[in-house]
Every structure is written in structure tokens, then in C-alpha cells.
Amino acid sequence: MADATTSRIDFSKIKSIINSPDLLKVQLDSFHNFIQDSVPLAKRKDQGLERVLRGAFPITDTRGLYLLEYISYAFDKPKYTVEECIERGLTYDVSLKVKLKLSYKDEADEPDWKETIQQEVYLGRIPYMTERGTFIVNGAERVVVAQLHRSPGVVFSEAVHPNGKKMFSAKIVPTRGSWIEFQTDINNQIFVYIDQKKNFLVTALLRAIGFARDEDILALFDLVEEVSLKASKREQLVGQYLASDIVDMQTGEVISARTAITEEIFEQILLAGYKSIKVMKSFSNNEKGMDKSVIINTILNDSSATEEEALEIVYEELRANEAPDIEAARSFLERTFFNQKKYDLGDVGRYRIKKKLRREFEELYSFIGEKPELKALSDTIEEKILQTIQTYSDEPIGEDILVLTHYDIIAVIYYLIKLVNGQAEVDDVDHLANRRVRSVGEQLAAQFVVGLARMGKNVREKLNSRDSDKIAPSDLINARTVSSVVSSFFATSQLSQFMDQTNPLAEMTNKRRVSALGPGGLTRERAGFEVRDVHYTHYGRLCPIETPEGPNIGLISSLSVYAEINDKGFIQTPYRLVDNGQVTDTVVMLSAEDEENKITVPVSIPLDENNRIAVETVQARTKGDYPVVAATDVHYMDVSPVQIVSAAAALIPFLEHDDGNRALMGANMQRQAVPLLTSDAPVVGTGMEGKVARDSRAVIVAEGPGEVVDVTADYIQVRYQLDADNNLRLSMLDPDEGLKTYKLIKFKRSNQDTCISQKPLVRIGDKVEKNTVLADSSSTEYGELALGKNVLVAFMPWRGYNFEDAIILSERLVYDDVFTSIHIHEFEANVRDTKRGEEQFTRDIYNVSEEALRNLDENGIVRCGAEVKERDILVGKITPKGESDPTPEEKLLRAIFGDKSSDVKDASMHVPAGMKGIIIKTKLFSRKKKIGLDIKEKIELLDKQFAAKEYDLRKRFAKWLKHFLDGKTSTGVYNDKGKVVVPEGTVFEESVLAKFATAQFLESVDLSRGVVSSDKTNKNVTRLIKEFRFLLKDIADERENEKYKVNVGDELPPGIEELAKVYIAQKRKIQVGDKMAGRHGNKGVVGKILPVEDMPFMADGTPVDIVLNPLGVPSRMNIGQLYETSLGWAAKKLGVKFKTPIFNGATYEEVQRELERAGLPTHGKVSLFDGRTGERFDDEVTVGYIYMLKLSHLVDDKIHARSTGPYSLITQQPLGGKAQFGGQRFGEMEVWALEAYGASNILREMLTVKSDDVVGRNKTYEAIVKGQNLPEPGIPESFNVLVRELQGLGLEIRIDDKVP
């Protein structure tokens, strides 16, 4: 059995108290939470597709005569299997059907709807996620990558003006709608920017939303002070500003608010008979000690004084023209921020604002509550804002209010004032509390919102143009509107990627990737250093090691092993709760925001036998700092040393001894390892190998306890045991009585042309438990990831051949196929119906020898098992020429001699240059319908098969129903309308039970009331009936699908009548030029392959397999490879495998101890002898076993040389690159080299006849063929391009041939 073989000696000192989650959970959960396909209609949550559809409906026309409402949605089963879709170039999808209700009436003012029509409407097809977390789109396996983007909510930041003054800003970022930014300037005022357009003062916005008077705005910020007019106060009041208008009742003279009080004005106010006045508070007498002068300065500079003036200012600044009237300006502002259709903060945006401004909201509610006048005004504004919003909360701002409110705007200004006073902190935009993940479900929801908005617009137009004639929902809905948006997302989005399938690790990493790029994200050019850098909040959430090396460095990351994404899109990581120094077993999932200001300690700190921290002080982590704190101050402890890195980095043993840059390369290069002919798991592993193999779905595992009943190379059958009830199987109605068949993948081509093949690990009669590995993949061994080979290595120079990281290999690795890999190439030919006639696959090709056709079958397709080389025919095909009409004489000759050669031309598909291999599989698909009789017979056969299936199902249902209910007394069985169908007291006999099997009864029975008094029996009967309904529908769907396939023939992409696919397998041995690497970033190219007898050998005559340059270790600082080398040698000698988890593995002393146990030198060095001379090398050499990978950078795919080939249309210079059969660029520096040597003739040739002198190169070719002298070069085409560009600038350039 597999388990015995994979046991490893474990060096870990710390055991994790929880298992890491399923590594594909991030993809699978997100998609299934979006579509909720397995959730009953009544229990569907308001999320994903359900929420999108609820938001898109109801739709009404402008006259108010029609109302289209949404009820529910459902999916059909996929028409084809995953394999069929890949083979035929189709999309693995399901059809979405939505139940809609259309109501209409004759007049808008009628209270009731005249008639309602309920109908299920087809809304298009949605790509469906496979159980591996991928999508099949047009036959290609794709992955939707999660996006890390700026979280909706409010973000506070600061900038420094050139004069040294700090300026603060607050941005409110919604999920959908206009961005609003509040910004202080150097003159101590607050401006508002909406969508980064022109700015206006914040007081104008406050007036526009309802705080019309200066006094109202000042009162909001507690800036109004009532001062009695005594002579003693004269000095205090002079220089202050009036908060409200002063009216002299006798003269009618008005001293307006904002007027600075002078001696003169003071006297005027006294004469007007005022006992006290309201003034704006000055900072000096503000009892709270907070300078709010920024509001006063803003008011004093505000040109508006009324709500109407403010509305005009806001409208003019944003629309760049005058408002037609005040109502238009008011409705524009309401639409921009207070309308749910146009503005949506989203659940996350509202949550973030409430969390960030919690204290400001509390202060605001408390302050407004104490001022009756202000409370009344605030309530009026709130009522106006929320009148269109259905709210369920008693708070002024509940979680369900997803538009902006006046409270949000005022609280943001409160916080800005605190920032100005140094009493608050700005946000860190790179903090993971301010960045969230949009996984596949959310991205799909966004596409549906776009598609349904377009569909809604079309429906409104149709409803508006309709008269009172009857219409049904299906007349209004065009399915293409929605499905075209979803299809274009999968085909063209930057986040929908062609899956990297080189090996299982590459596949899984692609699915766990988190990208900051994509729509609504960053761009490579704009992203600075800070956003790419590792942040302290990445701890346990995003891997600090695994990221690409190129321009995307830091923008694309991988989720850490234990990381999960919560329902709000924030990344969480688990911690153990620590209570007063006591480490508990309670595990909590913390987001970056939850963890902020908490003190956490690593899992490696010493604990006593009672799980208390055994030392008084510990080095802990809080924010980005590492202070030494008392054990009693610790809040949380890590759950595992592995939790900070991703799965790929966790596979690198002794990672703790490697430099970060090399660890990055090691993690990335494991993803490029090609599966080899035979796979070896590493002798020195980390314990993650089995987890990655299982979670990537590369291996097949048992679903529960059972027994293997049949094993072949193509399938494994397991009979699972009964469950806990001892009478319920995996499915009560399972016809196979718990028997499950697992089909094995055989020689399947991956997206990267590597080979995927599974082989069984179990035998007939083997007992299996849950998660027992049943079958291995091409990249696993006994259920563990196996990407490379364990080979004997020596670190030494060898005659200069391993200079600059080159690798020297033994010929044994070639002969024994140690690093041989299989690559499968797919070639596709299709038949189209062209204007000139239909193309045809055939063996009958004119002017082609019988020798060339020897391997083709009667359809013109190469036979399986044939060995082919370049230019061999794979698929014979002819296509019509479409020549001019033949003369009568030609027609007669053709009729007599049957010469068809001039009608058609050979369009056969050949093996491309440089390729040879064996044909392992061919497929032919045809759209053409079979003849009528054939179809009729097939459909009759299908009907018989499915009728038998259904009969069998009903028989099993009756058997189980009898088992549960026979002889028991009914408590009353009701239908869904409350009508009794089996009266209370009825004994369940065969005649009564027969009712249950009828379709009408099963559809209408109300299961919630129960059928008998026993709860257990009711539970079993309910489960049985639900299962029966489901399986019955399953059979009906399957029958329809099979009939469709028979009627339609093979479904193919549009325009294609027939499709032929040919698969060529190549065995590629390791050769000079191939790239290899270890797991520590120790990469190199094979420089020389030596005969075994020339390799350095040990004293016992054992030659080494591979020689690496020792100079590649010290400067790279990846010492982990030396630890691995020595421990690997000990493992091979002892015949065991080791498990050394990262940060928790073998120490230097333990490696020495294992070497000693194996009878090897403890320093890991031995004397080696030169294979060529037999002499001993002067110094001892580090020798051992290292795990080496062959990477998918093979020299066969890269080597290329051009003779003549295609040229660029504009410059007429040869194209570049292997794909274009291009040449090597002869660039500026190469020109300098020829100039330096004075090689004038070669230089002239390079720049003219060998490049873009079109006339010259043709003449040169002619001269070479005829054996004549070469002609004089002409003018290069690039010179003509330069001339034309100058002419385009208006400069006339003429070439004067007469100049001597």
C-alpha cells in the first residue's frame, strides 16, 4: 500500500494544532457561493448571482403600465463532459434559466395589475467551474486569478507642499459611482474634488445637502459661541466674526454673518438693542483644545450663502455649464451620491467607513442629539436622503445603507480636522486592511451587472414601444446580451489566464495567485516601489517569497498556506489565542485589521507542560516592529512555522538557510519542472509534498472506508461501506450499492504540451480509508509530489566545463532515461464550407506518392502508432481551387479521364520542421447528421435505455419507502397547498405507498410536516424523496442531452464541418543546452555530458551523476543545497526518506548525526578520483544526493537558424524570433565591432543585401545561383522609410544621383 512507502523520518519539533485548508478552496468556494447551485431556492442567500438578479429587477416602462419582476433562477446540467469539451474546442457551461413575472394594466393610475404572466426564460450559458477549480473555454483550460485591489471605503492620506506645510486628504471610494475627495490646502481651507474634476469649498457641499446657513454649519462643528454684550467683553469680541445676521429692527440695517467685529460694529450692535450675539469660536477659547479654524476659514472664503447658490456652484463645477433650474441641480447631486442605482458603497465600503469613523460617528450622534434645532435639521436631511432606500436598522446608518449620507460627509470632515491637529493618523494604502481580494465569484458578478444593465435598457425600450397587446417575458429578453459580456470576460480579461499546467504545482499556484493588475487595479508602469514591497500585514496572508522576477515583481503574489479569504474579501490567517500567558487551543481567523495593534509571538517560543509560555519575556511582533514584551502581554501565537509562506516555498527544504532572492527563484522554478518518464519523490522533503499532490487533484483519493473491487490501467473500482446509520449508503438510491468507478487519465496533453498520465497504486482486495491514495499522476510518487530526481552530486570544477553555472552530467542519466520526459503535441485540421465549395479529408491526393500516404487511413488521417518526422503528412486534405470556368473541351477530357487535379489543391497538414515522434491518438469529429433511419434507431435505443434506468430507480425507491414506512401509521400527509393526501391514522400498506411513486404526488407533497411520528423515519423519508426527485430530473436531463447529441451530430465551433486532431508524443532525453535547477535557486544549463568512465568517482568506484560548480554557492548564499546534499546522502545510505519542514526542520547537528549513523564523514566531504587519469583530486569534495529538476526551457524548443524567410512589410528587414522563422538582429554594437576591425565589405553586406536592400538581395541570390560575381548594393529600404518620415514632417528630401 502507498502509505507504508511514503513514511518519512520527521525532524519537526513543533506540531501544528490545525490542518491547512484545501489549497483550492479559494477558487471553489468563491464560484459556488456565487451560483449557489446546490442550495435550495428558499435558502439562497442574498449574494452572488441572486443579489445581482435582485438588483437588476424589477424593470418598468416609463408609462408605468408594465412591471417585470424576478422570482428565481435555475441551472441545467452541462451538455458535455470536461473531456468532450477539451477535445471538440467547446465551452464547459450550463444554461441559466430565470423565472420572471410580467404584470401589466391598461392605465397607470389603476391600483391593481390586470394580468400577470409567469415564465421561465433562457438567459444564456455560463462557463461552469470544474472540480479542479478551472474553466474550459473554447476547449482551453483557463483560470480566473483573484485580484487584490483598493478596498472601497474611506482612505486618509497626507502630502507635503513645497513650502513644507502638510496637506491632508480623505477619499471616499465606492464600489460603483463617483469618487469624492476632501483636501486641505496651504491656506487652511477644505476643498472637495468629485471624480478629480474642478474643486469647490466643502461648505458649499454641506449647504447643498441641507445645512444652508452659516450658523447650521458652525453648529455642526461646535463653532458657535453666544457672548453677552458687556463692556468688559468688548476687547474679547473685537476681531471675531459674526456667526449669524444682526438686524437693527428700527433702521432695518443688516450686519451679515462672517463680518469681522470692529469697535464701530460693536457700537452698532449695542445700539440695535442686542443683549447677546452669536460669534464664531476662536481657537483660543475653544475648551476642547482642538483648532477648528479650518472650517471658519472655509466659510469666510465661501462665495455661497444659501442652499440654492451652493447647488449652482456644485452643478457648474461638475458639469461645466449652468444648471437649467435649482431642481435640476438638486436632482443631479442626489443622483451622484444618494441614489442606489448610481452610487453603491457596497457591503465592504459601508463596513470600512463605519469601522474607520466609529469614534467620529459616536461623537456626531451624541453632539447632534443634544442640540434640538440641529437634530431636527439632521432628521429632515436624513429622511430626504433615505426616502428611496429600504432600511432595516435602528441606527442612523445601518449596514444596509449603501449610499452616502450627511453623517458620512460630516464624520470625514471631523477626522480631517483631527488630522490637521495631529490627533489622528493617516492610512497606509499598502496595508492589507485597505486592500481586498476580488475572487472569481465577485468578478463574475461584476460582469453580470454590466450584462443585465444592458439587458434592462433593451427591455425598457421594448416595453415603451409596445401597445397593450399581450407579451410574455420571453419576448423581452435577449439572452445574447448577458452571455456575450460573460464570454468576452473569459476570453479577453487580463485576469482570465490560460492555465499553467506544466506540473501539478504550477497548476495549483496559478489558482492561488493574487494579482494587483487588471481592470480597476494597478499597471506595471504606474506601480511604485512601496506597493511592490513586502508589508508587515502580509505575514501569514501573502507569501513574502513567491513572486515573478520581471516587471511584475511584487504585483503578483501567492496566498500563504493557511490563508483564507473572508466574506468581505479580506485575507485572514489563523492564530492561537493567548490568555494571560496561557496558550489555548482556540484558533481564531484574523484579518490584517483585526490583528492591528495586537501582540503576536512565533510558534517556536518555549511552552511548559500546561501550555503556558515558559519564559517571562519573549520577542514578539506588533505592526512592523519586534519588541521584547512580557509573556502576559501576548495576545496571539502563530499556528505553524509554515504559515508565512506559499505552498511552493514550503516545498523547499532548509529554506531558512537560503537567501530570499534564491528562495524566490527556487519557488518559481519548481513550477517549470517537466514531468519525467518515471517520477521520484525527494528523499529530503518538507512534508508538504503529499498535501500539494492531493489538493491539486493530481492524484485520486478514496472518499471513505471501503474495498478495491477492480483495478485496470484505465479505471479503479471501490465499493464504499455503509455509513453510520448502517442502512443509508452514500446514496440510498445508488444502483451500484456504493460502488464507484474512477477513470484514470492516460497520456493526456497538458496546456504546456507536457504529459499527464495516472497509474493505479492499489490492488484488488485492498482495504482503503478516507484520503487513501488510489492512483498516482505523472508528477507524483505514492501520493507525494515528485517533480525531479535524486542524483549523486559533487561540488567541484571540472576542466572549466562548469564555468558560469554550467552543469556536467553523466551519460548514465541519458542512457537510463533518468531525465527523459514525454511531450505531447496536438495538431488540428478542420474542414470548412468555403465559397468555392466544401473542403474534404481524404487519402486520395493528386501528385503525392504512395510512400507519403502509407500511414494514412481511408479518411486521410494518420494511423496510431506511426512514427513520423518533419514534412510527413498527418491529415490529408484537399480544398477547391475556384479557378475560372473550364472550356467545353476541358470538361469533356475531365469527364473521360476523371482528372480532378485541376479542381482542387493539396491542403494537407504536415509535421512541422524539427519535430519527430509517435502518433498516440487521433480524433475525428463531424457535424454532419447521420442518415434519418440511423438517427431514429439510435433515439429508440436511447429511450429504451433511459426507460429501464427510470424503472430501476422507481423500483429501488419503492423498496426503500417500504423499508421505512411499511406497517407504520400516518400522522397526516399534506400537499403544498395544505390539502390532506393521506389522512391521519392511515396505515402505510402497499396500495398507499404506491401513491408516493406518482409524479404528481412527489412534486406536490409537503415534506416539512413529516409523515409519521418518528423524527428519524421522517428524516430518512424526506432525504429519500428529495434524492428520488433529484435523480429523476437527472435521468430526464441526461436523456435530453443524449438525444440532442444524436440529432445534431458532433457539436463543433461555428463554421467548422469536420475536425481532425492528431497527437504526437516525443521522448526527449536530457541534452546539452537544457536548463536544470535544484530547489534552492541553483539553476544552470547542461554544459557537457561525459561518459560514465570520465566522471569523478569515489573510493569504492561509484561515479557521481552530476558535477556542480562550488563557486555557485557562496555568493548566492543558498546554503540550503549543501544541507540537502549531505542529508540526502545519509537518506540514500540508510534507505529512508526525511521530512524537514521549513523553520522547523533538521539542525546542523542532526544532519551530522544522520551522516554518522549512515557511516559517512560528518563534514560531508570525501576524496574523489579523476575518471580520466584515475588520480585522486588534491582536496576533498562535498558529495551527496540533491533533488534536481529538468525545466521546461528545452534546447529543442529554442535552437533555431534562418536561411531565408519572411520580411517586415514596412522596413523590408527580416523578422525576429523562432515563431516567425526570423533572423538574429545585427544591432548597433555589432556594427561597431565590424567597424573596429575595418571589415568594410562584410559591414556593407550586413546593412544592405543581407538585410533590406530588396533589389540587391534578389540580384545577389540570382548571382549566387548562377555562379556570377555579386552586384553592387542598392539603397536599403530603411533609408526610404526615413525619407518618407521626413516628408511626413514637411521636409522635402531628394536623392541626387549626379553628385560625384
Curated annotation (Swiss-Prot):
The RNAP catalytic core consists of 2 alpha, 1 beta, 1 beta' and 1 omega subunit. When a sigma factor is associated with the core the holoenzyme is formed, which can initiate transcription. This is DNA-directed RNA polymerase subunit beta. GO terms for biological process: DNA-templated transcription. Keywords: DNA-directed RNA polymerase, Nucleotidyltransferase, Transcription, Transferase. Its EC number is 2.7.7.6. It comes from the Bacteria. CDD domains: RNA_pol_B_RPB2. NCBIfam families: PRK00405.1, rpoB. Belongs to the RNA polymerase beta chain family. The keyword Transferase applies. InterPro entries: DNA-dir_RNA_pol_bsu_ext_1_sf, DNA-dir_RNA_pol_bsu_external_1, DNA-dir_RNA_pol_su2, DNA-dir_RNAP_su2_dom, DNA-dir_RNAP_su2_hyb_sf, RNA_pol_bsu_bac, RNA_pol_bsu_CS, RNA_pol_bsu_protrusion.
